[in-house]
Design a protein with these regions (language model features):
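Conserved histidines in hydrophobic membrane contexts and catalytic metal-binding motifs
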Residues: 67-70, 81
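Short beta-strand
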Residues: 57-59
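Short, non-transmembrane alpha-helical segments in secretory-pathway proteins
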Residues: 30-55
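A short, surface-exposed beta-strand/turn
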Residues: 77-91
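Glycine-centered tight beta-turn/hairpin loop motif at sheet-sheet or coil-to-beta transitions
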Residues: 72-74
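Short, low-complexity, Pro/Ser/Thr/Gly-rich segments in the mature regions of secreted, periplasmic
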Residues: 95-104
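Classic N-terminal secretory signal peptides
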Residues: 1-23
Length: 104
């Protein structure tokens, strides 16, 4: 009986976690206003590619553009950019911050 209760409790816990909405990581917030005023992710990818980046993936996180890719120096990173100005705000490699813009 106790085993059945534990299994039911575990199943309910897993189901509750699975139905939680995706949340921002909290590493960076941009407060960039409505998305209608943002530049596109495609424009950011084009700009980074011209600078020598290899972009694997982009997404919106915390009101910023989050980019997974390789820098021109060959570092595989996660980077955050302001969606209006494309200012680089944070770059981290394997959880270690290697660049953070002043004030962020």
């Amino acid at each position: 009986m106790k085993t059945n209760f534990l299994l039911l409790a575990a199943a309910c816990g897993v189901a509750a976690l699975a139905h939680q909405p995706a949340a921002a990581t909290g590493r960076m917030t941009c407060n960039a206003g409505p998305q209608s005023g943002w530049r596109t992710q495609a424009q950011l990818i084009e700009r980074l590619t011209r600078q020598g980046w290899q972009v694997r993936r982009t997404k919106i996180d915390g009101g910023c553009y989050e980019v997974y890719g390789t820098t021109p120096q060959g570092d595989r990173v996660e980077a955050y950019f302001h969606p209006v100005t494309f200012r680089q705000l944070l770059v981290s490699r394997r959880g270690q911050v290697i660049f953070r813009a002043p004030g962020h």
